[in-house]
From Swiss-Prot:
This is 1,4-alpha-glucan branching enzyme GlgB. The lineage of its organism: Bacteria, Pseudomonadati, Thermodesulfobacteriota, Desulfovibrionia, Desulfovibrionales. The gene is glgB. It comes from the Bacteria. It catalyses: Transfers a segment of a (1->4)-alpha-D-glucan chain to a primary hydroxy group in a similar glucan chain. Monomer. GO terms for biological process: glycogen biosynthetic process.
Amino acid sequence: MTIPCSRPLFIEPFDLYLFGMGRHRHLYRILGAHPAVQDGEAGYRFAVWAPNARSVHLSGDCNGWRHEGCPLFPVGVSGVWAAFVPGVRRGSLYKFVVRGADGRQEQKADPFALWAEMRPGVASVAWDIDNHAWGDGAWMAERARQGLPLERPVSIYEVHLGSWRRRHGDGHPFLTYDELGDQLIPYATGLGFTHLELLPVAEHPLDQSWGYQTGHYYAPTSRFGSPEGFKRFVDRCHQAGLGVILDWVPAHFPRDAWSLGRFDGTALYEHLDPRLGEHPDWGTYIFNYGRNEVRNFLTANALYWLREFHIDGLRMDAVASMLYLDYSREAGQWLPNRHGGRENLDAVDFLREVNTVIHAEFPGAMTLAEESTAWPGVSRPVYTGGLGFSFKWNMGWMHDTLGYLAEDPIHRAYHHGSLTFSMLYAFSENFVLPLSHDEVVHGKGALLSKMPGDMWQQQANLRLLYAYQWAHPGKKLLFMGGEFGQWNEWDESRELDWCLYRFPAHEGIARLVGDLNRLLRSEPAMHRRDHDWSGFRWVDFADYGSSVISFLRLAAGERPLLWIFNFTPVVRRFYRVPCPRGGTWRELCNTDSAYYGGSDVGNAGAVMAREDHWGGGHFIELTLPPLAAMCFAPVTGQGT
């Protein structure tokens, strides 16, 4: 084998200056591996940041995986090592052999690798970025023109690509990106979802981590194909009218010796002190957000997914663990900030910076925070003191609602506040209402199995839950399998129980989800004022004895929608509900319809509002189906 001879590589001083300042927005085009030609020879240029390393060599299939012979050369005092290596081809596997400041030699994956080999291998793959001709220009232009979808319908289908569907019989369990495009896109659009949210697709070594322990931050996982395969998938989503959100993990990274940890023999990407640099629950390292180069690594990574893969949004995982220095720590296990407080000021600055940069460079791209505390202003602009996210997951709504519905209906009257409490803070943030993967794992059971009663009551409760979620102010998110009433808890090692579609009750649940999405899209009152009190008005929140609530969804100049919910299995006849106008109110939704698997109790499709001579105004008198929600709209007239 001919051993290629590496050569010094020139890097523009301004690029190195921007990197040192933490401000290089195209950093992934400077560091990492990229095709190049030098002195008429084709090869790849390699660059890696390892300021405390004693030496760095390239090892790969281009040189028989020798640990020496292809050295990288220090670029001034920047801490970057770089070289041009002729003869390296697209698809070549490689690692960096780093002799650290501690004298130890480790084989490291490239932090900026554009692709990586299939697990259990962890080598990086020499690849290139500009390898796809995009066809989603109309989508991208319209997204930028419209801006954030605060007043537009957003219904998110959360998906783990490795277990949505699986192949059988050929030894490779995963669908390719192209096969996922053939099957997942028409399925999600057929149900009326506006966006997919994908659990992390950045390369990760352990299937059981679901992608939340990222090994290669810049490499789409090879489980489903190549980076351009993922680009084709996103392109097809956009051309079908479906947005794509990625779960992104800037909170922590795994301790594997080949990864970012102790990269140059020192705590480079993480803090040295375990009270700052190690997560006690997950056994992972925490990024040092106060270091310019680390912050640049993460910020450029966020921009990379948005720019190079046309991603429509990033959902940031475990934001609460970033914000608090004492997160999941006892007294004496954490260090206070410079003011003596528990807030991680460096992480706060990082989150504000990355949100500001994303919204400036990509108008219309969303950032979503999984933040489970009462930190103020998560989805408020940075210039007002907020963190700058577009949306925040409403974990309180999820916890209270699922807790309420887990109660036997006979006890729900004593927990009525759990149902109504969310409206006290519903407009304090731009909320997404999540029924996510976290609620159907680790012994929690599937959503359907959380519901009390016999099989019919469980299914009715689930339909009631979905109607309440869609009617409640806030954007919507549902994890895969929930749309047809998956019985079993989610297992990342097997596909969903698609056989349940053969049962009419489960098919009915899917029909309901599709109709709720169509109602969300077609009725402005269902989405236009999701984050403002002017879009919601209680009709009756106090009938705890019957476990019935009712409210209006409103939009200026549009017809109001009246929602009524009966959280007991009792049919309530001649039930009076105030309404804002007289005339006929047509039924738009009844979750007890036989079409959805219900008992078909209803009001023949419409009710007549009558004048209330005693208290003024108008009311309707109707039959409330058991464990069901109903939605009515006035037949004539506009506005509120």
